[in-house]
């Protein structure tokens, strides 16, 4: 007599230590093998886009801090750049260099946190995370020097910055740039030579090139699948066209490659930072921008390469001091949409390793 079996539906979350926020995964299992996955989000929805339409352009800057709250500086940059484009505001040379410095520091800090949490998801509880937070703490202290905040910095302004870098910032940054490459090498050696990490990541959770494109994957997730796409190089903004750097690309699109891309990107960020510090000019840090901004009627889309991928802002102005439409293109949500293609066919034990490798923040997914 044939045995009749049924697939098992398993809910992981919405309150689970590995979901990186309040998030639910609804998975269908055939034994231990995943046959289907549905990400269920919205638990952290705050209505940021609608709230922003009821406030002035300046009052909306703090909302950007609370999207990917591990990438606040780059979020600020993407938004103020969109408003500057809409209003025709010019940014001074020194301010552009400072923006590059802060963006690349934010990229390193975000990758350090992402890799630490990824290893937590693999089962290497706390120790690697604390190693990486040791270096991230030095970057957070630099952000604290210039903004007065350790999180949600609210430092960028239309036309530049409200205040210049403090005197102690650059000496502390130079010390960090001297020591950080050695620690990145240490992290790579500890992780890439660990047999358990290799077994659980190499060839696991592959996102093929065509699926990465079709799902609009972004950032390290996209480049790990062999797509040479980075806004800093493909559509340069700010002054990124003045710097020499490489775009790390992998070819397998597996969990290991997504980890490795972030290691390589941190090295490139250090190289960009050294060039920016060396060439940082003197001068004004704030362009001419009215205190009450009323951009002419029109629309604009502006994008940057954030730590998680292409972050864009679409703004519509009706000529008043408040945006008529305020829309975010969130890379975390786009990468999350590719998760099903990565996990189907793998065992439920591999799910969190694959999920951790895409490095999402639910504040940006739900908004």
From Swiss-Prot:
Reaction(s) catalysed (UniProt annotation): a quinone + NADH + 5 H(+)(in) = a quinol + NAD(+) + 4 H(+)(out)
InterPro entries: NADH_Q_OxRdtase_suD, NADH_UbQ_OxRdtase_49kDa_CS, NDH1_su_D/H, NiFe-Hase_large
Enzyme Commission no: 7.1.1.-
The keyword Transport is annotated on this UniProt entry: yes
PANTHER family linked to this entry: NADH DEHYDROGENASE [UBIQUINONE] IRON-SULFUR PROTEIN 2, MITOCHONDRIAL (PTHR11993:SF10), NADH-UBIQUINONE OXIDOREDUCTASE 49 KDA SUBUNIT (PTHR11993)
Family: Belongs to the complex I 49 kDa subunit family.
SUBUNIT field: NDH-1 is composed of 14 different subunits. Subunits NuoB, C, D, E, F, and G constitute the peripheral sector of the complex.
Protein name: NADH-quinone oxidoreductase subunit D
Organism this protein belongs to: Dehalococcoides mccartyi (strain CBDB1)
Lineage: Bacteria, Bacillati, Chloroflexota, Dehalococcoidia, Dehalococcoidales
